[in-house]
UniProtKB/Swiss-Prot annotation:
DNA-binding region: 55-78
Gene Ontology cellular component annotations, sorted alphabetically: cytoplasm
SUPFAM superfamilies: Winged helix' DNA-binding domain (SSF46785)
Gene3D superfamilies xref list: Winged helix-like DNA-binding domain superfamily/Winged helix DNA-binding domain
Task of the protein: Transcriptional regulator acting as an intermediary between major regulators SarA and agr and virulence genes. Represses alpha-hemolysin (hla) gene expression.
Listed GO biological process terms: response to stress
Family stated for the protein in its record: Belongs to the SarA family.
Official protein name in the record: HTH-type transcriptional regulator SarT
Gene that this polypeptide is encoded by: sarT
Originating organism: Staphylococcus aureus (strain MSSA476)
Compartments where found: Cytoplasm
Principal place of residence: cytoplasm
Length: 118
C-alpha cells in the first residue's frame, strides 16, 4: 500500500514540476502566464467560423477560478490577441471576438510554444 502511495506522490510531484517549468518557460520566452496559454489554447481548439466565444464557456471548460480567466482575457485583449465586448442581447454576458488574423497569430504562437517545449 505504501509503495502505491509513494508512486502516486512521485507522479504528482512530476506534474507539479512540469507545470512550474511550463510557467517559467511561457513567462520568459513568450511573456504569457499559464492562464493566458490556457485561454489561447481554448480559442485554438474551439475555433469557429464566427470567431465568437462566450466568456462563461471558456471559464466552464478550463475550470479555474473565474477571476483568473477574466484577468487573463483582459491581458490578452490589451496585447491584441483578442477583443471582448458585451452581448448586445444580454449585457451580463461577455463575448470574446477573434479575427482571422488573430486566430492565425494564436495558432502560430501555440505551434512555436509546442515546438520549443519538446
Amino acid at each position: 500500500m505504501n509503495d502505491l502511495k509513494s508512486k502516486s506522490n512521485i507522479k504528482l510531484m512530476k506534474r507539479v514540476l512540469t507545470t512550474y517549468e511550463l510557467r517559467k518557460y511561457l513567462k520568459k520566452y513568450f511573456c504569457l502566464t499559464l492562464d493566458n496559454y490556457l485561454v489561447l489554447a481554448y480559442l485554438d481548439v474551439f475555433k469557429n467560423d464566427e470567431g465568437k466565444y462566450f466568456m462563461r464557456d471558456i471559464i466552464s471548460y478550463i475550470g479555474i477560478d473565474q477571476s483568473r480567466i477574466v484577468k487573463s482575457v483582459k491581458e490578452l485583449s490589451k496585447k491584441g490577441y483578442l477583443n471582448k465586448c458585451r452581448d448586445p442581447h444580454d449585457s451580463r454576458n461577455v463575448i470574446i471576438v477573434v479575427s482571422v488574423k488573430q486566430h492565425n497569430y494564436i495558432k502560430n504562437l501555440l505551434s512555436e510554444i509546442n515546438i520549443n517545449e519538446t
